[in-house]
């Protein structure tokens, strides 16, 4: 009973917070001048179930410690998945002229580390994602990034001590999105980056595990060549946009993931030098923070809305900003969490109370 209660708390935290395969997997290191080396895609996508490598997993509360890393174990049911799909459908049925809608669901890290002895510990991500897609309207463009991410499973794509994907993991999600959206993804081969070392994330904070403490993370963020004007908006007005910076470079330590978009702002906007007529809004939780900056390489305008905190006139904002593409990007837990689904639905009702975990 105690484990079940703790699991419900963890699922709520995972959907609500902003915030390597083994300890030998690179965690990027502290060198702030490095560029990310992206490995070429292998020809064959690896199987989901890996051979038994002798590694033993230990449950500490709702965190599964395995291969010197922390994981949450997904077990979402189809009923909640269908409710999520119905909410996405409701935006399609508003029939906003010229608005193209995408849905991208992000798997969690354990999906790519399952070994034979633990194959029944968590529900396969693709089973849950495809069940949602099956319940969605055909007009919605559905993006399952599992295969693209799996091709890179030996890279540093999820944190060791935190539930989020790294910026490299988010990059492979971005590549999946580009394939569906008819875009050319930027190559990271020559993009400079900076790194924030010494990151101990949510799993460490929940468990205080010495195993996780001895396998700390680092947070890498990319310095893209195109100039970006970054603005912070408000729920109270469609016209207020205060100029700021896309990266909160002052953060460190346990807050390092908040470098992306300054954490979980209710709404922010990025305007670029691209003049291609493509303007996108994202509805996200914190997984979207590391993902969103990549879109500045492809869109003239990117607006990011956190459904947990934004209570303004969302539909009015889409129209006022000339948005013609709408992406829902949520991790697989959030897509099966009642309060999160409720808050996405509530965006169509300005000022409605926010559901809590």
Enumerate the language-model features and the residues they cover.
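Bacterial N-terminal signal peptides that target proteins for export
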Residues: 1-6
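Extracellular glycan-modifying ectodomains
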Residues: 19-357
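Bacterial N-terminal signal peptides
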Residues: 8-15
